[in-house]
Amino acid sequence: MEVLAKHRFARTSAQKARLVADQIRGLPVAKALEILTFSPKKAAVLVKKVLDSAIANAEHNEGADIDELKVGAVFVDEGPTMKRIMPRAKGRADRIMKRTSHITVVVSDR
């Protein structure tokens, strides 16, 4: 049984979120939550929230035992980028790229 949860349009770059996702892939959920809780990265908070949601989905919808769940797959895809302009000196302007990402966590009992 596989259960997934998604956070779409998360306000972090996919590159930064993937660093966190790579740390928990394939681990038991208890160990993964422990790692995410003590990680100093902003993306760890976002990934932890999605993992908690996936665990709750597995327990509520499938009646799964939390102690047997493992993080099956974690992937982070790029979302749309919001483009903003920052005025600079002498009439110039720079582009600010506000990147978003889609975080998906799959938990399974296998």
UniProtKB/Swiss-Prot annotation:
Part of the 50S ribosomal subunit. GO terms for biological process: translation. GO terms for cellular component: cytosolic large ribosomal subunit. Gene3D superfamilies: Ribosomal protein L22/L17 (3.90.470.10). The gene is rplV. Keywords: Ribonucleoprotein, Ribosomal protein, RNA-binding, rRNA-binding. It holds the Pfam family Ribosomal_L22. PROSITE patterns: RIBOSOMAL_L22. This is Large ribosomal subunit protein uL22. HAMAP family: Ribosomal_uL22_B. One of its GO terms (molecular function) is rRNA binding. This protein binds specifically to 23S rRNA; its binding is stimulated by other ribosomal proteins, e.g. L4, L17, and L20. It is important during the early stages of 50S assembly. It makes multiple contacts with different domains of the 23S rRNA in the assembled 50S subunit and ribosome. Signal peptide: none annotated. It comes from Shewanella baltica (strain OS155 / ATCC BAA-1091). Belongs to the universal ribosomal protein uL22 family. NCBIfam families: rplV_bact.
